[in-house]
């Protein structure tokens, strides 16, 4: 029993795991879209149980469990990663995404884990831009710099649109 779990104002992370029993393995198979549907069903059940147990509405963070936690097929993680906004909209809770150095990145770009820094950063920026509220990373400094640059670029894009009369908001 962990005493910190009993703290009422402590947020919890609920992570999806395709394999229900034992240690995670690379044996779970299925179609990529089944991964997204499975994550959605798992989270719906988790949120329902959380609320029935009296959990605070804002006390749960959802983690789709990227990589082999979903499936050994890289397409499954790619499908979930490309649909984060759909998950977030359906569930209305914050998302935590952990894609740093995951095997599905290596399978996609054809590189070993030690060389996945750029692919990890690209996947992390994609996740942030598509609904992830939290990102677990192996390179926090690189991610912070990339976020700062992206935010600065977005400000310039907005300012340029406004200056040209393209901003109708």
Specify the residue positions occupied by each region the protein language model found:
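Active-site-adjacent loop and "lid" segments of alpha/beta metabolic enzymes
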Residues: 1-2, 12-53, 58, 68-169
């Amino acid at each position: 029993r962990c005493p910190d779990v009993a703290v009422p104002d402590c947020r919890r992370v609920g992570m999806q795991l395709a394999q229900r029993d034992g240690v995670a393995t690379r044996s779970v198979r299925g179609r990529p879209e089944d991964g997204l549907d499975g994550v959605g069903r798992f989270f719906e059940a988790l949120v329902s149980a959380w609320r029935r147990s009296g959990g605070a509405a804002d006390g749960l963070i959802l983690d789709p469990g990227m990589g082999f936690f979903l499936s050994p097929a890289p397409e499954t993680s790619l499908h979930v990663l490309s649909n984060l906004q759909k998950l977030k909209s359906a569930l209305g809770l914050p998302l935590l995404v952990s894609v740093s150095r995951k095997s599905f990145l290596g399978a996609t770009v054809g590189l070993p884990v030690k060389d996945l820094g750029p692919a990890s950063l690209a996947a992390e920026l994609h996740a942030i831009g598509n609904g992830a509220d939290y990102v677990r990373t192996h390179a926090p400094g690189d991610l912070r710099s990339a976020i700062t640059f992206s935010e600065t670029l977005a400000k310039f894009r907005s300012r340029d649109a406004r200056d040209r009369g393209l901003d109708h908001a």
